[in-house]
Amino acid sequence: MDKSDPENTPIREFMQTDFSRVHQETPVAEIYRSLTGRGCDDIIVCDEDDRFLGIITRMDLLSAITPGMGIRSRRKMGCLECIHKSAALHARDLMTRSHVTVPASATVAETLQAMEKNRHPDVIVVDDDGIAVGLVEMCDIIAFLVREGEI
C-alpha cells in the first residue's frame, strides 16, 4: 500500500460531509429539539445562500442554558455573553462568528497548521463561494496519519 503524503493529500479526501447545518433564522427552540435526536454536535450556521456564517458550539449551548451560573465568567453572577445568549431567539443570536476555516483545496498539512496556529481542534472546510462543505476534527487527521503509518 502506498503512503499518502500529508503535504499533498487534500483534506477533502476524508473531511466529514454529514454535519448539522441550520440557517441563521432557525429558531433556537428548533435547534434544541434537533439535539435530542442526534446528540450535541457543533452546528454550522449558514446564510440564505448556504455561505458559512458561524458555528454553534457546545459552549454556546451551555452559555444559553445556564446564564445565571456564569460558566464562562467563573462567577456566580451571569456573564454578559451568557445573558445575551440566554435571550437568543435564532441561530444567528447564539452562534460564535469567528471560527477557523480552510479552503476545500487545503492539504492535511495546511489544515494541521491552521489548527495549530489558531489553537483549535476542528476546522470548517469552505468552497470558493464560502459554502461550508465539510468539517475536520483533530481526531480525523490523527486517524488518517495512523492509517498512513505517519504516527
Residue ranges: model-predicted function:
Residues 1-151:
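Tandem CBS (Cystathionine beta-synthase) repeat/Bateman regulatory domains
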